[in-house]
Each structure stands twice: as C-alpha cells, then as structure tokens.
Amino acid sequence: MAVTKTIVVLPGDHVGQEITEEAIKVLNAIQECRPDKVNFKFDHHLIGGAAIDATGVPLPDEALEASKKADAVLLGAVGGPKWGTGAVRPEQGLLKIRKELQLYANLRPCNFASDSLLDLSPLKPEIARGTDFVVVRELVGGIYFGERKEDEGDGVAWDSEKYSVPEVQRITRMAAFMALQHNPPLPIWSLDKANVLASSRLWRKTVEETIKNEFPQLTVQHQLIDSAAMILVKNPTHLNGIIITNNMFGDIISDEASVIPGSLGLLPSASLASLPDKNTAFGLYEPCHGSAPDLPKGKVNPVATILSAAMMLKLSLDLFEEGEIIEQAVKKVLDSGIRTADLKGTNSTTEVGDAVAKAVRELLA
C-alpha cells in the first residue's frame, strides 16, 4: 500500500514558482511509476517577498505550522530588489524557518552532474575534474543569530559570533555521519579562523575532540578559512570529502564552491533537523541559487531544484533508490544536450523539466 508523504512547497519569489513546478513534475513522474509505493501530497504556502506583499510578514504562521507537520519542505527562492533592505525583508522568512524548524545542518554538494559540463567551469578542466565534496554548514548559530547593534545615528554598529560546545558537537556528528556513508570513509576538513577568533578556537578544539572520542576511524584536518578559499580555486580536489564550517564561513565558501561546476543552476542543498540515519530526517530542500529577478520567464535552470528534490527523497522520504534515479535522469538529459542558456543550451525551463520527467519514467519502466 502506498505511503502518503506530505511536502510543503514554498515557491517564494520570481523564478521560485517555475523551478518548484519542474521539481513537482519530476516527483509526479516518480509517483506515476511507483503508485503502490508512494503518494505525494503537495501543500503550497507563501514565503519571502510574495508573503510580504500578501500578508505583511515574510513567513506567515500558517506556512510555518504546515511546515512543522510535513515530511519535508521544498523551497524555491526568496528576495529581490523590490523589497530592498528595509525593516521587513524576504530573507528574514528564510532565517526564521531555519531557526523555528531547528534546521541546524546545511548540506551543499559540489560536484559535476555530468563530466560533459567540465568545459563550462571557470577553472581549467584538468583542475576542476574530479571535484567532489559536500559543505556541511552550521545553520542556526554564529554571527547571523548573535547579538547585534544597528547604527542608531551614532555611527557604530556591531555583530557578535557565539558558539557553544553542544552546537559544534552536533554539526560535527552530522559531518561524521556523511563521511561514514562511504567505504572507505571520506576525510573531513574543518574550516575556521582559529588564529584570530575565540569562537574558532572553541570550534577547532570541539571538532578535534568529538572526532577523536566518537569517530576514531575518521580523519579530520583543520584549515584556516582564507587558506581554504585559495585552495578551492587552485586545487579544489585537495578538499574532496566532507567540509565542516560555521554559519558565515559556510555561507561564503559554499557560494565560492558553487561556481566550480559552471552554473549555480546545477547545485542542490538540504537543511536538516536531525541525522538522516533512517533516511527520514526532517529537512528543507532548495537550490543554491537566488530568485534571479532579472531573468525572463522560461530561462531559469531547474536542475538544482530537481536535484534538491532527489536529496529530499534520499534523506527525508526514505526513497533512496528513487532519489538516485532522478540523479541518473538529470545526467542523461544533460549528456543529451538538453540544457538551459546558463549551460550554453537553447532549451526552456519546462523543456528541461519535461525531459528529466521523461527520463525518470524510462529508467523506472
């Protein structure tokens, strides 16, 4: 008998509507081919600028409550110049949902969905080839959630970075879990600024002790964040494995990493509230790119969102095989030359989504 999985869909702003529609199209193809296994129930709600326009707040209570009751959340993108940098901003909805749902771990893979895309990387193919790591970013602590003071006319503003041992232990265990999913286990790289920051010294000490005491079979190496940023351009495969870092450093380094495969439109992400040890962790899934307000309709690449849906199947919905099928379908479509303009292709958003859904049906036939 089919199990019903409830997915809250938060399209958000601008291209968010288009990309979530394509991901749903691919998920529906899974459902069509596995009618006895799964039934997806999609529950749409507002977030970001769209929510501000309709309700005055970036995350309405009903969207948050629905998300808490769901099996997983699929997010499009939030933000845009229309809403500026005023007191109420679209991005506040994203920060709030992360905090309220305790989505403490952000996972952002960086690899090539297909080797046929190597020539699109800003790095030389011989440098970029083989890049394969996951950034595990602590998502609900650090400077983004610390105490702060705005400039109130006195010309002074400040933000504070604070981490506790339990917070660092929790994200370290997530990185260790991800490393142990491979045989042999992947190496772990911990990025910090321990030569300057007290919070980074606590971070480094806690990561080191947690791995040593709880995961002695794993290796962890510490790298200063500025040095890691240089390595990422000069020799990205040196950092292959699992990269663990704090909220702000993770935000920056994962964006730097995201250009290596040639387009932000290729990279998925997952934000988890617990270890996915039974493939049923609650999570929010979204592409790494933003809302692209200047992009004409039909031009956005839906692959990142489709691959985010694949991560959702594998980590939250206990449909690991089906998640891998979506990844295979994406590779098949990209290799066939069906691509959006960011990948030097001529296909529309819906054409790429249609092609992936068709490939899924063929692979599951």
Curated annotation (Swiss-Prot):
One of its GO terms (biological process) is L-leucine biosynthetic process. PROSITE patterns: IDH_IMDH. The keyword Magnesium applies. It is found in: Cytoplasm. Its main location: cytoplasm. Binds 1 Mg(2+) or Mn(2+) ion per subunit. Substrate binds at R98, R108, R137, D226. The record marks Y144, K193 as: Important for catalysis. Its EC number is 1.1.1.85. Mg(2+) binds at D226, D251, D255. Pathway: Amino-acid biosynthesis; L-leucine biosynthesis; L-leucine from 3-methyl-2-oxobutanoate: step 3/4. It catalyses: (2R,3S)-3-isopropylmalate + NAD(+) = 4-methyl-2-oxopentanoate + CO2 + NADH. Its cofactor is Mg(2+); Mn(2+). GO terms for cellular component: cytosol. Belongs to the isocitrate and isopropylmalate dehydrogenases family. Homodimer. Catalyzes the oxidation of 3-carboxy-2-hydroxy-4-methylpentanoate (3-isopropylmalate) to 3-carboxy-4-methyl-2-oxopentanoate. The product decarboxylates to 4-methyl-2 oxopentanoate. This is 3-isopropylmalate dehydrogenase. It comes from Candida glabrata (strain ATCC 2001 / BCRC 20586 / JCM 3761 / NBRC 0622 / NRRL Y-65 / CBS 138). The gene is LEU2.
